[in-house]
Amino acid sequence: ALDAMTKLKLQDEMLRLWQMEHITMVIVTHDIDEAVYLGQQVIVLDRHPGCVRHIYDIEQSVPRDRTSLEFHRQRDKIYKEFFRVEEKPFTYAI
């Protein structure tokens, strides 16, 4: 685990390297803010292994402003999907 300031600095460094080197990065995180800040796409996985629930394209330019309305709009949209409760049909066995 990292303290908050170190985490933010490392995220900025990752973006700098990505822009400088033009490389592909795959980042796995449970932090939605981090995903929106670093990602070009955010993939929300289902609780079933290997199942994709939704793919979001992040269309903000880099560097991103974590305080912008667009950043919060995209984060909130993903947050709602991430914590969406799936309705289960009522089933029973005799």
Regions found by a protein language model. Name each.
Residues A1-L2, T6:
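Short coil-to-helix N-cap segments within the nucleotide-binding domains
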Residues D31-D33:
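The feature captures the ABC ATPase H-loop/switch
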Residues R47-K77:
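Conserved beta-strand-loop-alpha-helix hinge in the C-terminal portion
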Residues Q11, R75-E81:
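Short proline/glycine- and basic residue-enriched helix-capping loop/turn segments at helix->loop/beta transitions
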Residues H22-V28:
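Conserved H-loop
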Residues Y37-V44:
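Conserved catalytic segment of ABC-fold P-loop ATPases
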Residues K88-I94:
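ABC-family P-loop ATPase nucleotide-binding domain
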Residues K7-E21:
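Helical segment within the ABC ATPase nucleotide-binding domain
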